Amino acid sequence: MTSKANEFRFGAHQFLWKSHWTDADYGILDQARALGLTLFEVSLGDDVAFDYRRLRRHAEALGVELSIGPGNDWPMECDLSHDDPGHRARGLAWHKRMLERAAECGAAAYCGAIYSHPGRACRRPPPADEWPRAAENLGLLAEFASGLGIRLVIEPVSRFRNHLVNTSRQAMELVELAGHPNLSINLDTYHMITEERDYGAAIRRAAARLWCVHACENDRGAPGGGLVPWPAVFAALREVDGPVRLLLEAYRTGPEGFGFSRGIFQDLCADPEAFVKQGIGFLQTQANPGPR
């Protein structure tokens, strides 16, 4: 089945605006909706606290679908695939707490490198039981998330962030090993530039489990004008059966930003509104190229 243009859904991550969500930030959600976005990702962590149910009410009133990611303070000892069984147990308990908060937010999905930790990249031969223990814990977490009505979504990241799942092939293999129907995949065009040789093939490989795509350029800037082969990306996305979610992910830079803390040293997103207009405008043109 081929996707139609009106099945593309566009959104953005809170990180375009700020690092930590608070109850003073609902104007950001209003701005995102006014810019035409219908999907928004909010980040949770031990250093984040706000009225989760208020976020749910606000998003529902705007008609915005929410995804949640554990992108703020995530303890290193909370890791579903760690060699230490204590770390794995703490990881399972920690993600369950985040999922409960995500449920209060009314989130449709909980997305990230939740098979491990995006701050742990081990430079050693993988232990034989590393993937099986990751799969086992993902299965347990997916079942817990299912009971809350939330889809559990894993994101392959580059070798500089983690060693376990870098490609769409590995993501599919881990999802299949876990064997739970509530597991999906979130691809990221920034991480893919390091790990994938063929964007189209990578997307097609994950298509049956694809929940969303984090869309940005190879430098984390707005889509368009960089190294990402967008025609190949959209040719593959048009073949996805069901809605295609495209979500801008970058980090606020400039005087009001926090990009330095995330390893972004160029001024790529000083004006979130301009970033969204440029990025979504480009993506919409790619999604709806018109008659040929």
Where are the model-predicted features located?
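Conserved radical SAM core fold
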Residues: 72-79, 117-121, 217-220
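Histidine-acidic metal/acid-base catalytic patches
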Residues: 1-11, 23-33, 106-108, 169-187, ...
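Acidic-and-aromatic substrate-binding clefts and catalytic sites of carbohydrate-active enzymes
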Residues: 17-23, 41-54, 118-122, 159-165, ...
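Catalytic-core regions built around general acid/base machinery
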Residues: 53-63, 137-145, 202-205, 232-236
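N-terminal pre-domain/capping segments
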Residues: 1-107, 266-292
